[in-house]
């Protein structure tokens, strides 16, 4: 008998003896175990969550922090979602502990009370099992040029050519995204892509874009442009793939495009590792070709990311780069979906879907860490303004005998009440900031140690939600009128003043704050429902709190009025973190009409805007159009999916939560006929 035969006989003998003993066990015999799994409340709640998820119509209707960046239900999402309540409890316990350490005379449990009373909301506190993680970032890619992703724990060294750049770039996106709760902006992506194009084909490659570089036996000859587009396809389709490290969501990626003055202001003194400087002509060509390619590619597959922003400088009554301005309007005419950021100075960069980041520096000197791109929000806490206003009213005004009518004499009392809450939130942010530094010092935030981002350059953000409803409760109309304008100015300027007052850049761990109208994709629904359930006033004409200065379901507010309401008389210099003006249209306009709108926006100080026209896709033949249709013009099918933005990124409406799908039906999509856009 061989050793193999002997082992085989021994195996079956042991199994046979075990099964014989097992067979002698009576079915009704009581077997003692250390755990009563069946009656364990923790286990029962988790199983109940799984059952709810299985029965839900889509992922957004079953998850803790729903968003539309998920395309189907699967076990990977369950794995990410099932422990979110536990993550939240851990996060809150850590913040309370740090509050006690930093502020021994402050009642740290007030943090829990403010959260559970829905006065404030801590964004993405459930996203990480480690409970503490930064929110979003705009990175510098310079460390990527020097060391690849080794500093992130990867194996890839610095890229040497265009092919390796594209591959390692995708790896970098997934590696960094896995360590942030929100978006990762790579504003230098096309700048560095252009750098490697020059290495591949020479400095004048863009002038020879139709030059044939390969003649395959089977297939069309490949030109420089075709090869470039192939690399873009690799990058874009890769970053749109779901990632296990993000709960089966794709990475939330933002790209920026620059006009010439913005490029010169941001990168005028920038040098690549080999001592060369970027030039405007080649980058401009790459930017335009990429935008045209990406817009056309969305007729093949509706791609969600990157979220794109074009920056335009407007000064002395005109756009300084007229060529880029004209190109932007042409792209809008052709159905391209992107944001436009208008500024009169190169002191800020809009890198997320609504956030205006004032840059701490524009110096590009990697050795001392002064990288102007590095910014973002490391923590976001949002105020439920509608509830806060009503709590103030109940305390200060409800006992008045005469009928209450809000006027400017009440602002002192209101701002005093709101300031007390703001002051507490600074403490909460301070505690969270120190917890982030604890993670940083323990080596758990490698993106920072590797130099992609500096924790001291990121903001602690105070968000606002429920602005419209707060104003309506006080008897105001949310249209362009002096009373509502003053209300916005008073509220926003209070936050800005307090942000400056509490700013600390002298300590080792900097505290810098900003305020913004947060997107509130799921929070807007939550706050509305919380307030309604708790007996606070909520309007009947909507089912959520929107993130705009105007009400997106108000048919009486025109496109130009919406622009003014996101301009200098409402936001201006008062709201230091910004807000995005979403203009919903029923069809795309002409380039001339878009020029009129952008010019009007620039003159009225509306810094950040975009246009939303629903896209449509036939379920049967796959035909895609950049405007809605009920019947497919190609095959005649009526099985149609619509795509639009909730706030920042383009997704299938069927993937939205039920509440957001309902809200979509109430949006006013403006119909504009004439070249001259009237009120």
What are these regions (language model features)?
Residues 2-3, 8:
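N-terminal amphipathic/hydrophobic targeting modules at extreme N-termini
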Residues 3, 14-15:
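Short hydrophobic transmembrane-like helices used for membrane targeting/insertion
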Residues 22, 27-456, 477, 481-642:
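Conserved catalytic cores of very large enzyme subunits
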Residues 191, 460-473, 493, 645:
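Contiguous, well-ordered alpha-helical segments that form the cores/surfaces of helical PPI scaffolds
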Residues 226, 473, 668:
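Metallocofactor- and cofactor-centric catalytic cores in central/energy metabolism, strongly enriched
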Residues 455-456, 460-463, 653, 661:
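Core of folded catalytic or high-affinity ligand/protein-binding domains
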Residues 627-679:
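Long insertion/accessory domains within large nucleic-acid-processing enzymes
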